[in-house]
From Swiss-Prot:
This is Phosphoglycerate kinase. Pathway: Carbohydrate degradation; glycolysis; pyruvate from D-glyceraldehyde 3-phosphate: step 2/5. Keywords: ATP-binding, Cytoplasm, Glycolysis, Kinase, Nucleotide-binding, Transferase. Its main location: cytoplasm. It comes from Jannaschia sp. (strain CCS1). It is found in: Cytoplasm. The gene is pgk. GO terms for cellular component: cytosol. The keyword Oxidoreductase does not apply. Belongs to the phosphoglycerate kinase family. ATP binds at residues 197, 319, 349-352. It comes from the Bacteria. Its EC number is 2.7.2.3. Disulfide bonds: none annotated.
Length: 396
Protein backbone atom coordinates (compact mmCIF):
# COMPACT_ATOMS: atom_id res chain seq x y z
CA UNK A 1 0.00 0.00 0.00
CA UNK A 2 1.37 3.39 -0.97
CA UNK A 3 0.05 6.69 0.32
CA UNK A 4 1.50 10.08 1.11
CA UNK A 5 2.16 11.08 4.71
CA UNK A 6 2.82 14.49 6.22
CA UNK A 7 6.51 13.84 5.60
CA UNK A 8 5.87 13.96 1.83
CA UNK A 9 4.10 17.32 1.91
CA UNK A 10 5.30 20.92 1.64
CA UNK A 11 2.93 22.71 3.99
CA UNK A 12 4.69 26.03 4.57
CA UNK A 13 2.20 28.88 4.36
CA UNK A 14 -0.60 26.57 3.23
CA UNK A 15 -4.11 25.97 4.49
CA UNK A 16 -4.34 22.26 5.32
CA UNK A 17 -7.86 20.82 5.31
CA UNK A 18 -7.62 18.14 7.98
CA UNK A 19 -10.40 15.55 8.28
CA UNK A 20 -10.53 14.39 11.88
CA UNK A 21 -12.85 12.21 13.94
CA UNK A 22 -13.92 14.13 17.03
CA UNK A 23 -17.36 12.53 17.25
CA UNK A 24 -17.03 12.33 21.03
CA UNK A 25 -19.63 11.69 23.74
CA UNK A 26 -20.94 14.78 25.51
CA UNK A 27 -23.12 15.54 28.49
CA UNK A 28 -24.69 18.94 27.99
CA UNK A 29 -21.81 21.27 27.16
CA UNK A 30 -19.08 18.94 28.37
CA UNK A 31 -17.07 16.31 26.49
CA UNK A 32 -17.12 13.20 28.68
CA UNK A 33 -14.45 11.20 26.83
CA UNK A 34 -11.77 13.13 24.93
CA UNK A 35 -9.86 10.08 23.67
CA UNK A 36 -10.58 10.80 20.01
CA UNK A 37 -9.54 14.41 20.49
CA UNK A 38 -6.21 13.58 22.11
CA UNK A 39 -5.40 11.14 19.29
CA UNK A 40 -5.44 13.88 16.63
CA UNK A 41 -2.96 16.10 18.49
CA UNK A 42 0.21 14.72 16.81
CA UNK A 43 -1.19 15.47 13.35
CA UNK A 44 -2.25 19.02 14.19
CA UNK A 45 1.08 19.72 15.91
CA UNK A 46 3.05 18.37 12.94
CA UNK A 47 1.09 20.52 10.49
CA UNK A 48 1.87 23.59 12.60
CA UNK A 49 5.53 22.60 12.86
CA UNK A 50 5.75 22.40 9.06
CA UNK A 51 4.34 25.91 8.72
CA UNK A 52 0.82 24.91 7.76
CA UNK A 53 -2.46 26.22 9.14
CA UNK A 54 -4.76 23.28 9.99
CA UNK A 55 -8.43 23.70 9.13
CA UNK A 56 -10.29 20.81 10.73
CA UNK A 57 -13.28 19.15 9.07
CA UNK A 58 -15.41 16.78 11.13
CA UNK A 59 -18.88 15.37 11.66
CA UNK A 60 -20.77 15.16 14.93
CA UNK A 61 -23.77 12.89 15.41
CA UNK A 62 -26.37 12.24 12.72
CA UNK A 63 -28.13 15.54 11.89
CA UNK A 64 -29.30 14.13 8.54
CA UNK A 65 -28.42 17.17 6.48
CA UNK A 66 -30.11 19.73 8.71
CA UNK A 67 -28.82 22.27 11.22
CA UNK A 68 -29.28 20.78 14.69
CA UNK A 69 -27.95 23.09 17.43
CA UNK A 70 -27.33 20.16 19.79
CA UNK A 71 -24.96 18.67 17.20
CA UNK A 72 -22.80 21.73 16.70
CA UNK A 73 -19.07 21.07 16.92
CA UNK A 74 -18.73 24.20 19.05
CA UNK A 75 -19.13 21.98 22.12
CA UNK A 76 -15.78 20.32 21.34
CA UNK A 77 -13.76 23.54 21.27
CA UNK A 78 -12.83 23.66 25.00
CA UNK A 79 -11.62 20.04 24.91
CA UNK A 80 -9.68 20.71 21.70
CA UNK A 81 -8.05 23.79 23.22
CA UNK A 82 -7.07 21.84 26.32
CA UNK A 83 -5.58 18.99 24.29
CA UNK A 84 -3.76 21.26 21.83
CA UNK A 85 -2.65 23.84 24.37
CA UNK A 86 -3.78 26.84 22.34
CA UNK A 87 -6.94 28.59 21.11
CA UNK A 88 -9.05 27.00 18.39
CA UNK A 89 -10.81 29.29 15.93
CA UNK A 90 -14.39 28.08 15.29
CA UNK A 91 -16.08 29.05 12.01
CA UNK A 92 -19.70 28.28 11.17
CA UNK A 93 -19.73 29.53 7.57
CA UNK A 94 -16.23 29.35 6.12
CA UNK A 95 -14.94 31.18 3.06
CA UNK A 96 -11.49 31.33 1.53
CA UNK A 97 -10.89 35.01 2.21
CA UNK A 98 -11.51 34.56 5.93
CA UNK A 99 -9.18 31.58 6.10
CA UNK A 100 -6.46 33.30 4.06
CA UNK A 101 -6.45 36.15 6.56
CA UNK A 102 -5.67 33.87 9.50
CA UNK A 103 -2.16 34.31 10.91
CA UNK A 104 0.44 31.55 10.96
CA UNK A 105 -0.04 29.18 13.88
CA UNK A 106 -3.84 29.40 13.84
CA UNK A 107 -5.90 26.25 14.33
CA UNK A 108 -9.41 26.35 12.86
CA UNK A 109 -12.44 24.09 13.26
CA UNK A 110 -15.25 24.30 10.72
CA UNK A 111 -18.85 23.50 11.69
CA UNK A 112 -20.29 19.97 11.39
CA UNK A 113 -19.94 18.78 7.78
CA UNK A 114 -23.13 16.72 8.11
CA UNK A 115 -25.25 19.86 8.51
CA UNK A 116 -25.30 19.70 4.70
CA UNK A 117 -27.02 16.76 3.01
CA UNK A 118 -24.38 17.04 0.29
CA UNK A 119 -21.74 15.66 2.68
CA UNK A 120 -23.06 12.11 2.96
CA UNK A 121 -24.15 12.16 -0.69
CA UNK A 122 -20.52 12.87 -1.64
CA UNK A 123 -21.89 15.69 -3.80
CA UNK A 124 -19.20 17.04 -6.18
CA UNK A 125 -20.36 20.59 -5.41
CA UNK A 126 -19.61 20.20 -1.73
CA UNK A 127 -16.31 18.45 -2.43
CA UNK A 128 -15.40 21.35 -4.72
CA UNK A 129 -16.40 23.91 -2.09
CA UNK A 130 -14.30 22.19 0.56
CA UNK A 131 -11.35 21.98 -1.82
CA UNK A 132 -11.62 25.74 -2.40
CA UNK A 133 -10.97 26.31 1.30
CA UNK A 134 -7.53 24.70 1.35
CA UNK A 135 -4.31 24.04 -0.49
CA UNK A 136 -3.66 20.53 0.84
CA UNK A 137 -5.92 17.79 2.23
CA UNK A 138 -4.94 15.56 5.15
CA UNK A 139 -7.16 12.67 6.25
CA UNK A 140 -6.64 11.64 9.86
CA UNK A 141 -10.03 9.95 10.30
CA UNK A 142 -9.58 6.26 9.52
CA UNK A 143 -12.77 5.63 11.49
CA UNK A 144 -14.69 7.46 8.74
CA UNK A 145 -12.66 6.08 5.84
CA UNK A 146 -15.29 3.46 4.97
CA UNK A 147 -17.69 6.28 4.09
CA UNK A 148 -17.55 7.82 0.61
CA UNK A 149 -18.46 11.31 1.79
CA UNK A 150 -17.46 14.71 0.44
CA UNK A 151 -15.06 15.36 3.33
CA UNK A 152 -13.50 11.88 3.31
CA UNK A 153 -13.34 10.89 -0.36
CA UNK A 154 -14.54 13.63 -2.71
CA UNK A 155 -12.19 16.39 -1.59
CA UNK A 156 -9.21 14.00 -1.48
CA UNK A 157 -9.44 13.64 -5.25
CA UNK A 158 -9.30 17.41 -5.80
CA UNK A 159 -6.26 18.43 -3.75
CA UNK A 160 -2.77 17.11 -3.05
CA UNK A 161 -3.56 14.68 -0.23
CA UNK A 162 -1.92 12.70 2.54
CA UNK A 163 -2.64 10.62 5.62
CA UNK A 164 -2.36 12.17 9.07
CA UNK A 165 -0.37 10.49 11.83
CA UNK A 166 -3.32 8.56 13.25
CA UNK A 167 -4.39 7.35 9.80
CA UNK A 168 -0.78 6.45 9.02
CA UNK A 169 -0.44 4.42 12.23
CA UNK A 170 -3.74 2.64 11.64
CA UNK A 171 -2.93 1.69 8.05
CA UNK A 172 0.58 0.55 8.98
CA UNK A 173 -0.77 -1.65 11.77
CA UNK A 174 -3.44 -3.20 9.57
CA UNK A 175 -0.96 -3.79 6.76
CA UNK A 176 1.29 -5.60 9.25
CA UNK A 177 -1.66 -7.69 10.44
CA UNK A 178 -3.26 -8.68 7.14
CA UNK A 179 -1.35 -7.19 4.21
CA UNK A 180 2.07 -8.76 4.67
CA UNK A 181 1.97 -10.39 8.12
CA UNK A 182 4.57 -12.43 9.93
CA UNK A 183 3.29 -16.01 10.13
CA UNK A 184 1.71 -17.93 11.72
CA UNK A 185 -1.27 -15.55 11.87
CA UNK A 186 -4.04 -16.19 14.39
CA UNK A 187 -7.40 -14.41 14.35
CA UNK A 188 -9.69 -14.23 17.36
CA UNK A 189 -13.28 -13.70 16.26
CA UNK A 190 -15.92 -13.42 18.95
CA UNK A 191 -19.22 -11.74 19.60
CA UNK A 192 -22.84 -12.74 19.80
CA UNK A 193 -23.83 -13.64 16.25
CA UNK A 194 -22.30 -15.41 13.26
CA UNK A 195 -24.62 -13.43 10.99
CA UNK A 196 -22.68 -10.22 11.67
CA UNK A 197 -19.29 -11.82 10.97
CA UNK A 198 -19.87 -13.82 7.77
CA UNK A 199 -17.86 -11.51 5.51
CA UNK A 200 -15.13 -11.29 8.11
CA UNK A 201 -14.78 -15.05 8.49
CA UNK A 202 -14.87 -15.55 4.74
CA UNK A 203 -11.98 -13.15 4.22
CA UNK A 204 -9.88 -14.32 7.17
CA UNK A 205 -10.02 -17.97 6.15
CA UNK A 206 -8.05 -17.05 3.03
CA UNK A 207 -5.47 -14.99 4.93
CA UNK A 208 -4.76 -16.48 8.35
CA UNK A 209 -3.53 -19.81 9.65
CA UNK A 210 -5.84 -20.23 12.64
CA UNK A 211 -9.18 -18.73 13.67
CA UNK A 212 -10.29 -18.92 17.30
CA UNK A 213 -14.08 -18.60 17.48
CA UNK A 214 -15.63 -17.48 20.75
CA UNK A 215 -18.61 -15.74 22.27
CA UNK A 216 -22.19 -16.56 21.40
CA UNK A 217 -21.25 -17.22 17.78
CA UNK A 218 -19.24 -20.26 18.85
CA UNK A 219 -22.51 -21.86 19.98
CA UNK A 220 -23.80 -21.77 16.41
CA UNK A 221 -20.74 -23.67 15.19
CA UNK A 222 -21.02 -26.17 18.03
CA UNK A 223 -24.71 -26.78 17.29
CA UNK A 224 -23.86 -27.23 13.61
CA UNK A 225 -21.61 -30.11 14.68
CA UNK A 226 -24.45 -31.72 16.62
CA UNK A 227 -23.42 -30.44 20.05
CA UNK A 228 -26.30 -29.70 22.42
CA UNK A 229 -26.03 -26.09 23.61
CA UNK A 230 -28.92 -25.97 26.09
CA UNK A 231 -30.60 -22.57 26.36
CA UNK A 232 -27.59 -20.73 24.92
CA UNK A 233 -27.78 -17.89 22.43
CA UNK A 234 -27.53 -19.74 19.12
CA UNK A 235 -28.47 -19.06 15.50
CA UNK A 236 -29.74 -22.55 14.74
CA UNK A 237 -30.96 -21.42 11.31
CA UNK A 238 -27.35 -20.77 10.29
CA UNK A 239 -26.23 -24.35 10.77
CA UNK A 240 -25.65 -24.89 7.06
CA UNK A 241 -23.71 -21.63 6.88
CA UNK A 242 -21.51 -22.64 9.80
CA UNK A 243 -20.81 -26.03 8.23
CA UNK A 244 -19.91 -24.34 4.93
CA UNK A 245 -17.46 -22.06 6.75
CA UNK A 246 -15.86 -25.07 8.43
CA UNK A 247 -15.54 -26.84 5.08
CA UNK A 248 -14.01 -23.75 3.48
CA UNK A 249 -11.52 -23.47 6.33
CA UNK A 250 -10.49 -27.10 5.96
CA UNK A 251 -9.98 -26.63 2.22
CA UNK A 252 -7.84 -23.54 2.86
CA UNK A 253 -5.80 -25.33 5.54
CA UNK A 254 -7.03 -22.83 8.11
CA UNK A 255 -7.49 -24.33 11.58
CA UNK A 256 -10.68 -23.44 13.45
CA UNK A 257 -10.53 -23.58 17.24
CA UNK A 258 -13.86 -23.88 19.06
CA UNK A 259 -14.40 -24.25 22.82
CA UNK A 260 -13.50 -27.69 24.16
CA UNK A 261 -14.90 -26.90 27.57
CA UNK A 262 -17.49 -24.36 28.62
CA UNK A 263 -18.71 -22.29 31.55
CA UNK A 264 -22.48 -22.55 31.97
CA UNK A 265 -25.16 -21.02 34.17
CA UNK A 266 -28.94 -21.03 34.40
CA UNK A 267 -29.10 -17.24 34.10
CA UNK A 268 -26.95 -14.37 32.94
CA UNK A 269 -26.33 -12.19 35.96
CA UNK A 270 -23.41 -11.16 38.15
CA UNK A 271 -22.29 -13.90 40.50
CA UNK A 272 -24.68 -16.49 39.06
CA UNK A 273 -24.00 -20.07 40.11
CA UNK A 274 -21.90 -21.61 37.33
CA UNK A 275 -20.02 -24.74 36.44
CA UNK A 276 -17.48 -25.99 33.91
CA UNK A 277 -18.39 -28.86 31.58
CA UNK A 278 -16.84 -30.54 28.60
CA UNK A 279 -18.36 -29.03 25.50
CA UNK A 280 -20.50 -32.09 24.76
CA UNK A 281 -22.07 -32.15 28.23
CA UNK A 282 -23.98 -28.88 28.44
CA UNK A 283 -27.11 -29.37 30.61
CA UNK A 284 -30.37 -28.77 28.74
CA UNK A 285 -31.48 -26.05 31.17
CA UNK A 286 -28.20 -24.13 31.18
CA UNK A 287 -26.61 -21.58 28.84
CA UNK A 288 -23.00 -21.30 27.68
CA UNK A 289 -21.58 -17.96 28.81
CA UNK A 290 -17.82 -18.40 28.49
CA UNK A 291 -15.08 -20.68 27.25
CA UNK A 292 -13.61 -22.98 29.88
CA UNK A 293 -10.07 -23.09 31.33
CA UNK A 294 -8.85 -25.90 29.05
CA UNK A 295 -9.92 -23.89 26.01
CA UNK A 296 -8.06 -20.86 27.34
CA UNK A 297 -4.94 -23.00 27.75
CA UNK A 298 -5.27 -24.03 24.11
CA UNK A 299 -5.65 -20.39 23.06
CA UNK A 300 -2.60 -19.31 25.08
CA UNK A 301 -0.54 -22.11 23.53
CA UNK A 302 -1.67 -20.98 20.08
CA UNK A 303 -0.54 -17.43 20.84
CA UNK A 304 2.78 -18.80 22.05
CA UNK A 305 3.59 -20.19 18.59
CA UNK A 306 2.05 -17.34 16.58
CA UNK A 307 3.79 -14.29 15.14
CA UNK A 308 0.68 -12.18 14.53
CA UNK A 309 -2.69 -11.99 16.29
CA UNK A 310 -5.73 -10.10 15.02
CA UNK A 311 -8.54 -9.77 17.57
CA UNK A 312 -12.17 -8.82 16.99
CA UNK A 313 -14.79 -9.69 19.59
CA UNK A 314 -14.84 -11.16 23.11
CA UNK A 315 -14.65 -14.88 23.93
CA UNK A 316 -17.56 -14.82 26.36
CA UNK A 317 -20.09 -12.59 28.10
CA UNK A 318 -17.25 -10.45 29.44
CA UNK A 319 -19.50 -7.67 30.73
CA UNK A 320 -20.36 -9.67 33.84
CA UNK A 321 -18.04 -11.65 36.11
CA UNK A 322 -17.22 -14.48 36.24
CA UNK A 323 -17.98 -14.86 32.53
CA UNK A 324 -15.11 -12.53 31.64
CA UNK A 325 -12.44 -15.05 32.62
CA UNK A 326 -11.64 -16.47 29.17
CA UNK A 327 -11.44 -13.06 27.51
CA UNK A 328 -9.31 -11.58 30.30
CA UNK A 329 -6.92 -14.54 30.55
CA UNK A 330 -6.47 -14.87 26.78
CA UNK A 331 -5.98 -11.11 26.37
CA UNK A 332 -3.31 -11.10 29.04
CA UNK A 333 -1.57 -14.03 27.36
CA UNK A 334 -1.48 -12.13 24.05
CA UNK A 335 -0.25 -9.01 25.83
CA UNK A 336 2.53 -10.94 27.55
CA UNK A 337 3.77 -12.38 24.24
CA UNK A 338 3.57 -8.91 22.69
CA UNK A 339 5.55 -7.27 25.47
CA UNK A 340 8.18 -10.00 25.16
CA UNK A 341 8.64 -9.00 21.53
CA UNK A 342 7.35 -12.34 20.24
CA UNK A 343 4.00 -11.22 18.82
CA UNK A 344 2.41 -8.48 16.74
CA UNK A 345 -1.08 -7.94 18.17
CA UNK A 346 -3.74 -5.80 16.52
CA UNK A 347 -7.26 -5.48 17.91
CA UNK A 348 -10.33 -3.44 17.10
CA UNK A 349 -14.07 -3.07 17.41
CA UNK A 350 -16.08 -1.46 20.19
CA UNK A 351 -16.62 -4.56 22.33
CA UNK A 352 -13.04 -5.63 21.75
CA UNK A 353 -11.56 -2.36 22.98
CA UNK A 354 -13.86 -2.46 26.01
CA UNK A 355 -12.84 -6.06 26.74
CA UNK A 356 -9.12 -5.29 26.49
CA UNK A 357 -9.54 -2.25 28.72
CA UNK A 358 -11.41 -4.48 31.17
CA UNK A 359 -8.46 -6.90 31.10
CA UNK A 360 -6.08 -4.00 31.71
CA UNK A 361 -3.97 -4.72 28.62
CA UNK A 362 -5.16 -2.28 25.96
CA UNK A 363 -1.84 -0.42 26.16
CA UNK A 364 0.13 -3.66 25.88
CA UNK A 365 -1.04 -4.67 22.40
CA UNK A 366 0.90 -3.54 19.34
CA UNK A 367 -2.05 -1.50 18.12
CA UNK A 368 -5.63 -0.94 19.23
CA UNK A 369 -7.98 0.42 16.60
CA UNK A 370 -10.88 2.56 17.79
CA UNK A 371 -12.25 2.79 14.25
CA UNK A 372 -15.21 0.44 14.66
CA UNK A 373 -16.92 -0.05 11.30
CA UNK A 374 -13.87 0.92 9.25
CA UNK A 375 -11.70 -1.61 11.09
CA UNK A 376 -14.27 -4.35 10.52
CA UNK A 377 -14.65 -3.54 6.81
CA UNK A 378 -10.87 -3.59 6.40
CA UNK A 379 -10.75 -7.03 8.02
CA UNK A 380 -13.54 -8.11 5.69
CA UNK A 381 -11.28 -7.25 2.75
CA UNK A 382 -13.45 -4.40 1.52
CA UNK A 383 -12.15 -1.28 -0.20
CA UNK A 384 -12.35 1.80 2.00
CA UNK A 385 -13.16 4.86 -0.15
CA UNK A 386 -11.22 7.26 2.05
CA UNK A 387 -8.11 5.10 1.85
CA UNK A 388 -8.44 4.44 -1.88
CA UNK A 389 -8.57 8.19 -2.48
CA UNK A 390 -5.31 8.64 -0.57
CA UNK A 391 -3.64 5.87 -2.54
CA UNK A 392 -4.51 7.72 -5.75
CA UNK A 393 -3.43 11.14 -4.45
CA UNK A 394 -0.47 13.27 -5.47
CA UNK A 395 1.90 14.82 -2.91
CA UNK A 396 2.12 18.58 -2.38
Amino acid sequence: MRFNTLDDMDLAGKLVLTRVDINVPVDGDTVTDATRITRIVPTIKDILAKGGRPVMLAHFGRPKGAYVPEMSLRVTVPALEQALGQPVNFIERPDRATLDALPEGTITLIENTRFSAMEEANDPKMAGFLASLGDVYCNDAFSAAHRAHASTEGVARLLPSCAGRLMEAELSALEAALGAPQRPVVAVVGGAKVSTKLDLLGNLIEKVDTIIIGGGMANTFLAAQGVQVGTSLCEHDLGDTARAIMQKAAAANCTLILPGDIVVAAEFKAGAANAVYDVDACPADQMILDAGPKTVETIAATFNTAKTVIWNGPLGAFEIAPFDAATVTAARAAAEETQAGKLISVAGGGDTVAALNHAGVADQFTYISTAGGAFLEWMEGKTLPGVAALEAAKPA
